[in-house]
């Protein structure tokens, strides 16, 4: 009995010693303000892992949404929107329809700008409603969050973080109008860094560099209608003039969904972290339904076809052209499509409303990937080493496709102009030409050869900001005027000195010349006068 007591006491001592040695871990509070649509898919993975590390997560989303739904690893707090579900769906439907209209007509351009204006107004009005919801703002203030995690493509989350005086972490692909470069004060020379949406590479001709330099000017109107309402709202809230850069410079860390395996080399700042491929991490087993499709494909394997979460219906004529092309290859095609079934759909093609894209791309029988070139799909293609046929539709997709094509890992087609034969030939090329597989496997090997996985890196930096209450180095460039940033005042000062020295030197030389040669000339002239 005495022995049993001693054993029990010894166990208690060991437990106390262990508790003394181990650091106390206390979960923090994370406020997430997501951008709806596909950006939420990456943010969602970070939220899942942050919750798994013992932190409380509150996701703040609008009542009217596409993808943001409550789940067991976060608490969803919704706020009222000044528009109905019907209004929102109608606007999004019009935007989808614009994708498949000729892009070079003036009418299409005007309609696109009008839809963008309406969408921007909905977003800014929704943000106004959120920030003027006094009970909700009071609740958020009292919750004492340690960090705000948001995508600054929609500036509402960044503005809310600044308004609550809470450190923020941005997770993004890019921001329109180079605002990500301005917000980080990262050098951005137009001579070799292609502007997003220009479809330029980092090796540009003279005319491409002209386009690259002028493109920000052409985007001014888009920036004005997209982001100026947020600057006005911020100025109203803070009772002083607040610029977009003021809002963005509040961020402690910027998590870019990029990787230099895909993107072109460029300067970066200390608080810029690259987590491209973050959506490749979580992979579940293939379901029996899709396992059956794959096993039935035989030696030819499968082709995965998806235009992303935003677009799953296309015009009937174009759908029939695509169906005809898919019937010309021996592979089994799994096509994520919710529209009307094309009447000419071949036996080798299966329509599904949803597919486990990342899991299917990782299967050894997958031969090719038909994608709209969204960043999620592109990185999943790279992670799994699958050559791609790219049908870019809008936004950064054209640039993503250009990057893959320049690396010899895929073929790009214009979805509006391509024929059935074009698509079939592109598929046969990337499947049968071994160079495409070799190039994508090389990219995959480079991308995966890293000390820390992208998802783990993202979670680390979120916790870093929580531990240190921000603590990111703030570039002094934020405190400079535009002419100080470009050293124009210094250049002007030095130029003034050079001109002054040159002027004084010239005057001195002129004076000396006059003294030395002017007098001699006058003497000679006087001598000649006496002779005559």
From Swiss-Prot:
Q: Which UniProt keywords apply?
A: Endoplasmic reticulum, Glycoprotein, Glycosyltransferase, Lipid metabolism, Membrane, Signal, Transferase, Transmembrane, Transmembrane helix
Q: Where are the transmembrane segments?
A: 490-506
Signal sequence span per UniProt? 1-27
Record bears the keyword Isomerase: no
Q: What Pfam families does UniProt report for this protein, alphabetically?
A: UDPGT
Glycan-bearing residues? 141, 295
A GO cellular component annotation here is: endoplasmic reticulum membrane
One GO biological process term is: vitamin D3 metabolic process
E.C. no: 2.4.1.17
According to its UniProt record, this protein's enzyme class is transferase
Matching SUPFAM superfamilies: UDP-Glycosyltransferase/glycogen phosphorylase
Q: Provide the family line.
A: Belongs to the UDP-glycosyltransferase family.
Q: How does it assemble?
A: Homodimers. Homooligomer. Interacts with UGT1A1, UGT1A3, UGT1A6, UGT1A7, UGT1A8, UGT1A9 and UGT1A10 to form heterodimers.
What job does the chain carry out?
Answer: UDP-glucuronosyltransferase (UGT) that catalyzes phase II biotransformation reactions in which lipophilic substrates are conjugated with glucuronic acid to increase the metabolite's water solubility, thereby facilitating excretion into either the urine or bile. Essential for the elimination and detoxification of drugs, xenobiotics and endogenous compounds. Involved in the glucuronidation of calcidiol, which is the major circulating form of vitamin D3 essential for the regulation of calcium and phosphate homeostasis.
Q: What is this protein called?
A: UDP-glucuronosyltransferase 1A4
Protein's organism: Oryctolagus cuniculus
């Amino acid at each position: 009995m005495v022995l049993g007591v001693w054993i029990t006491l010894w166990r208690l001592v060991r437990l106390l010693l262990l508790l003394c040695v181990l650091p106390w871990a206390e979960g923090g509070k994370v406020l997430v303000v997501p951008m709806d649509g596909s950006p939420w898919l990456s943010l969602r993975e970070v939220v899942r892992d942050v919750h798994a590390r013992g932190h409380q997560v509150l996701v703040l989303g609008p009542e009217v949404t596409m993808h943001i739904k409550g789940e067991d690893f976060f608490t969803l707090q919704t706020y009222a929107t000044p528009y109905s579900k019907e209004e929102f769906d109608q606007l999004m439907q019009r935007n989808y329809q614009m994708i498949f209209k000729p892009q070079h007509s003036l009418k299409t351009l005007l309609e696109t700008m009008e839809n963008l204006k309406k969408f921007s107004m909905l977003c800014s009005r929704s943000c106004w409603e959120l920030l003027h919801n006094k009970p909700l703002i009071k609740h958020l203030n009292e919750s004492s969050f340690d960090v705000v995690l948001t995508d600054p493509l929609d500036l509402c989350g960044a503005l809310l973080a600044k308004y609550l005086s809470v450190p923020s972490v941005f997770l993004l692909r890019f921001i329109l109008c180079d605002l990500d470069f301005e917000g980080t004060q990262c050098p951005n020379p137009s001579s070799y860094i292609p502007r997003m949406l220009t479809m330029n590479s980092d090796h540009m001709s003279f005319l491409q560099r002209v386009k690259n330099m002028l493109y920000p000017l052409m985007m001014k109107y888009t920036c004005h209608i997209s982001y100026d309402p947020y600057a006005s709202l911020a100025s109203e809230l803070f009772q002083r003039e607040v610029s977009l850069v003021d809002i963005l410079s509040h961020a402690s860390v910027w998590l870019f969904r990029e990787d230099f395996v895909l993107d072109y080399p460029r300067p970066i700042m200390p608080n810029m972290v690259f987590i491209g491929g973050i959506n490749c991490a979580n992979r579940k087993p293939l379901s029996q339904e899709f396992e059956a499709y794959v096993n039935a494909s035989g030696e030819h394997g499968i082709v995965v076809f998806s235009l992303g979460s935003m677009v799953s219906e296309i015009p009937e004529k174009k759908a029939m052209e695509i169906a005809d092309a898919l019937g010309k290859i021996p592979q089994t095609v799994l096509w994520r499509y919710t529209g009307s079934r094309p009447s000419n759909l071949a036996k080798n093609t299966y329509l599904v409303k949803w597919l486990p894209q990342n899991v299917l791309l990782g299967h050894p029988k997958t031969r090719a990937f038909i994608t709209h070139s969204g960043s999620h799909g592109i990185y999943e293609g790279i992670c799994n080493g699958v050559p791609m046929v790219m049908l870019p539709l809008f936004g950064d997709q054209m640039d993503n496709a250009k990057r893959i094509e320049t690396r010899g890992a895929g073929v790009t087609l214009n979805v509006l102009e391509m024929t059935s034969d074009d698509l079939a030939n592109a598929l046969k090329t990337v499947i049968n030409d071994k160079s495409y597989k070799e190039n994508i496997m090389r990219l995959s090997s480079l991308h995966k050869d890293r000390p820390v996985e992208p998802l783990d890196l993202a979670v680390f930096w979120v916790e870093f900001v929580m531990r240190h209450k921000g603590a990111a180095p703030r570039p002094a460039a934020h405190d400079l005027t535009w002419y100080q940033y470009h050293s124009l005042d210094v250049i002007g000062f030095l130029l003034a000195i050079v001109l002054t020295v040159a002027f004084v030197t010239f005057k001195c030389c002129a004076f000396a010349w006059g003294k030395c040669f002017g007098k001699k000339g006058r003497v000679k002239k006087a001598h000649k006068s006496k002779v005559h």
